């Protein structure tokens, strides 16, 4: 299946080829390039300005979409990754550690996908085992001990559903994280940067502020899974995506998300540095607001936030 924005991709490629030809052959294509770039701007507005839910799902899953580590390395200084759950395991599908954000020490945790087949296998395609959630909880408890704000990056299809993961307590690990995060006396900000899939996302997603990138999704099940359950046909995923209300605008309207971070036109993968700047700006603003609250106020407001969802 071709991407929905294939005409834009093809035109961008043509413009780059013309730029290269002008440089290598010393030819003047200024007029032609101006026309093509104007045509590209109109095409981008037409396609990206009228996206449906399934189009956003495609962008959220883009193989070049920035990951947790991409953002952490761009928005934070002195990041030190910490490993292991202290029970003999280190799940590479969840990364975390301590870093400095504008001079303030923070704990950062997030799902981590791979950029190629080899890394995806090592990171289990960003689907954590229970040990990943236990590692995340260990880092969050450490953040509480040292009074550090917690920032989590959500980007997973879901917790790994394999038999071994279930035998080692997948449900218990996620449930314990939900319980513990609800009462942590430090600011917690969660950002959905790609896919937010079911309990696998919630396992690091109980927070004071839930932010979503413009083209991210957050849902109890994938569109393919919903289509298979509802209509016994996973190929109806596009239809399911439209009815599930899983996009950032949907979730903001429903009171689940607390804010949307705008994306670079065409998706975050097209300019990772600019996207990181956008994310950092909003993150700093939200962090400044939350750090002014007392621990008691944080827990009270967090509890109220979740009580209001669905009412």
UniProtKB/Swiss-Prot annotation:
Domain of life according to the entry: Bacteria
Chief localisation class: cytoplasm
GO CC, any one term: acetyl-CoA carboxylase complex
EC number: 2.1.3.15
InterPro entries: Acetyl_CoA_COase_a_su, ClpP/crotonase-like_dom_sf, COA_CT_C
SUPFAM superfamilies for the chain: ClpP/crotonase
Enzyme class: transferase
UniProt-listed GO biological process terms: fatty acid biosynthetic process; malonyl-CoA biosynthetic process
Gene3D superfamilies membership: 2-enoyl-CoA Hydratase, Chain A, domain 1 (3.90.226.10)
Annotated Pfam families: ACCA
Reactions mediated catalytically: N(6)-carboxybiotinyl-L-lysyl-[protein] + acetyl-CoA = N(6)-biotinyl-L-lysyl-[protein] + malonyl-CoA
Pathway: Lipid metabolism; malonyl-CoA biosynthesis; malonyl-CoA from acetyl-CoA: step 1/1
Record's protein name: Acetyl-coenzyme A carboxylase carboxyl transferase subunit alpha
Originating species: Exiguobacterium sibiricum (strain DSM 17290 / CCUG 55495 / CIP 109462 / JCM 13490 / 255-15)
Annotated gene: accA
């Amino acid at each position: 299946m071709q991407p929905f924005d294939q005409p834009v991709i093809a035109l961008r490629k043509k413009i780059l080829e013309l730029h290269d030809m002008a440089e290598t052959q010393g030819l003047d294509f200024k007029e032609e390039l101006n026309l093509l770039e104007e045509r590209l701007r109109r095409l981008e507005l037409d396609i990206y300005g009228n996206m449906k839910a399934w189009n956003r799902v495609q962008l959220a899953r883009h193989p070049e979409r920035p990951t947790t580590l991409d953002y952490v390395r761009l928005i934070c200084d002195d990041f030190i990754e910490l490993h292991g759950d202290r029970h003999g395991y280190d799940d590479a599908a969840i990364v975390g550690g301590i870093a400095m954000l504008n001079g303030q020490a923070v704990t950062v945790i997030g799902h981590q996908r791979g950029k190629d087949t080899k890394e995806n296998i090592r990171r289990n395609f960003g689907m954590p085992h229970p040990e990943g959630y236990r590692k995340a909880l260990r880092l969050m408890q450490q953040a509480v001990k040292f009074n550090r704000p917690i920032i989590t990056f959500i980007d997973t299809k879901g917790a790994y559903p394999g038999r071994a993961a279930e035998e080692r307590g997948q449900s218990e690990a996620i449930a314990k994280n939900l319980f513990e995060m609800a009462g942590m006396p430090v600011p917690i900000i969660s950002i959905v940067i790609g896919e937010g899939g079911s309990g696998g996302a919630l396992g690091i997603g109980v927070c004071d502020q839930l932010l979503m990138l413009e083209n991210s999704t957050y849902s109890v099940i994938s569109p393919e899974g919903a289509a298979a359950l509802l209509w016994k046909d996973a190929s109806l995923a596009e239809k399911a995506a439209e009815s599930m209300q899983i996009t950032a605008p949907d979730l903001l309207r429903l009171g689940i998300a607390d804010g949307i971070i705008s994306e670079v036109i065409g998706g975050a993968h097209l300019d990772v540095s600019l996207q990181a700047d956008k994310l950092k700006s909003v993150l700093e603003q939200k962090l400044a607001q939350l750090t002014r609250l007392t621990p008691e106020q944080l827990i009270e407001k967090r509890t109220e936030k979740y009580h209001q969802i669905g009412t």
